[in-house]
Amino acid sequence: MSENDKSEKMKKEGIDYSKMGLMSGLEIHQQLDTGKLFCKCSGYLRQDEPDFVVKRKLHAVAGETGEIDSAVEHEAALDREFYYQGYNDSTCLIELDEEPPKQVNQEALDEAIKIALLTNCEIYQITQVMRKTVIDGSNTSGFQRTFLIGHDGYIETSFGKVGIDSVALEEDAARIVEKDDKKIVYRLDRLGIPLVEIGTAPDMDTPEKMKEAALKIGEILRACKVKRGIGTIRQDVNVSIKGHDRVEIKGFQDPRMMVETVDKEIVRQQKELEQGKKMGEVRNAKEDGSTEFMRPMP
């Protein structure tokens, strides 16, 4: 029986999510409608031909622990080349990782604080810019700058409260304009646009509760100075059932797809457990509700 058939069978019979030990959470990334986060560039996307292209490659090296991250090693083994397109009048040395970042954009910081307050978070009185490793070439620096704004918040749903673990402000990645097995071409116009990341607690025990939480957070974001349209918001789902490691599913544009996708992911994880597998990984959401492997979990 295929995953689709099993998912349909489970729908008809009623899924006992509690018995399965379903744990799920959301990560929502929303672009802010301000200038870029660490430079003075405007942050609008361009369709005209770029003025220049820079080529680079990823090299896997050991981190502070003395070990090479498995996800970095996986990407480096692909031996891909990364090309970065830029413009003479709207791309700066910071975006090329040839100059240190400037002071954080105050307008973006104010909007992030507003979102944290609207999700009932405690605001950090002191915060520090951190660096998250990025392995797919979408950040010229090899990492993403991010800092925490709020913590321990919540939103109300008809299923009860959903915890908000954190609200962070970070920089968006460059956007892909061309890709094949050995090459990815990025455009630098999106790199550095401010993103607010909202991470919920893993306390949603049904897909319907997750969908409602995503819609509620969307309402809050639309009350703030955010960009609108396709690609300006990205929603990721973290899912696990009893005995299986966490799986991150990326690429949701419509929260209504979450219910079907989570049901199919439950079937997939059940099948893996039957085969003696339980490893976490990162997967990409597809329009039919299925998912496909992207990379190992970092």
Model-based region annotation:
Residues 2-298:
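Basic, nucleic-acid-interacting segments
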